[in-house]
Amino acid sequence: MTVKCNKCKEEINKEDLEKNYYICPLCGKLNRMPAKNRLQMLTEKFDVMFNDQEFTDPIDFPSYKEKYESAREKSGETEGVVCGRGTIGGNDTCIFIMEPNFMMGSMGTVVGDRITALFEYATKNRLPVIGYTVSGGARMQEGALSLMQMAKVSAAAKRHSDAGLLYVVCTTDPTMGGATASFAMLGDIIISEPGAMIGFAGKRVVEQVTGEVLPDNFQSAEFQLKNGFIDDIVPRQEQRAYLANILAIHAETVSA
């Protein structure tokens, strides 16, 4: 089976792409990585948690059920985020990874419930949280309830922080909308993948509202790093070692 690179549009053997961390061997483009593959890249072991919430359609949005079922089939996941507990470099941690193939990781009530529950579990068990974001923002099919997830998850992250515990975020392409306006930017350390798009509204919308002409790359990870919005850009194949080092330092601090 072959897949098409999002940048060079060349057909690539899917197995080869997976082995190369979804990085195109022809042009170097970082293609969007499913949550399960990212977990395989990062962890030695991982136990899924908070995976039992049922589908809800709170405002009876037309065709939402059909789109939801299609997203489940396409992604192989039950929702737009996978949460659980695992080890990275032998360090025990809680992890959430958003799923790009499930409605582009959009935030609905189940996504908010899962991430909130993970933070609460991590706070109770005094564990750090590693979060990978990829999101188009709030899920419009759930109306105002999707926007409420921003405050709910942010409050849980704040309680985790108040307990003196570590939260590291890796923003991946794209991290936009309500995710950027809440938990994606609350990490003690915020890293990103090369070339990731990070922002709230799209470039065209911002230009229309402000009346200004903006640089083409103003929402790129490189622009954000240059202007102090994130802390580091880490190549995908180096992230496991990078996070393991941070977790090891934090473990020494907590136990001291």
Curated annotation (Swiss-Prot):
Please give the cofactor(s) recorded in the UniProt entry for this protein.
Zn(2+)
Protein residues bound to Zn(2+): C5, C8, C24, C27
* Domain CoA carboxyltransferase N-terminal: start-end pairs: 1-256
Location comes to: Cytoplasm
Cell cycle in keyword set: no
Q: Which PROSITE patterns match?
A: COA_CT_NTER
Q: Cross-referenced InterPro entries, in alphabetical order?
A: AcCoA_carboxyl_beta, Acetyl_CoA_COase_Trfase_b_su, ClpP/crotonase-like_dom_sf, COA_CT_N, Znf-ACC
Q: Name one GO cellular component term.
A: acetyl-CoA carboxylase complex
Q: Zn finger regions (C4-type) covering which residues?
A: 5-27
Cofactor binding remark: Binds 1 zinc ion per subunit.
Keywords of this entry: ATP-binding, Cytoplasm, Fatty acid biosynthesis, Fatty acid metabolism, Lipid biosynthesis, Lipid metabolism, Metal-binding, Nucleotide-binding, Plasmid, Transferase, Zinc, Zinc-finger
Which GO biological process entries does UniProt record here?
fatty acid biosynthetic process; malonyl-CoA biosynthetic process
Documented EC number(s): 2.1.3.15
Cross-referenced Pfam families: Carboxyl_trans, Zn_ribbon_ACC
Q: In which pathway does it act?
A: Lipid metabolism; malonyl-CoA biosynthesis; malonyl-CoA from acetyl-CoA: step 1/1
Keyword Oxidoreductase among record annotations: no
Assembly, in brief, is:
Acetyl-CoA carboxylase is a heterohexamer composed of biotin carboxyl carrier protein (AccB), biotin carboxylase (AccC) and two subunits each of ACCase subunit alpha (AccA) and ACCase subunit beta (AccD).
Give the matching HAMAP family: AcetylCoA_CT_beta
What this protein is reported to do is described as:
Component of the acetyl coenzyme A carboxylase (ACC) complex. Biotin carboxylase (BC) catalyzes the carboxylation of biotin on its carrier protein (BCCP) and then the CO(2) group is transferred by the transcarboxylase to acetyl-CoA to form malonyl-CoA.
Name of this protein: Acetyl-coenzyme A carboxylase carboxyl transferase subunit beta 2
Source species: Lachnospira eligens (strain ATCC 27750 / DSM 3376 / VPI C15-48 / C15-B4) (Eubacterium eligens)
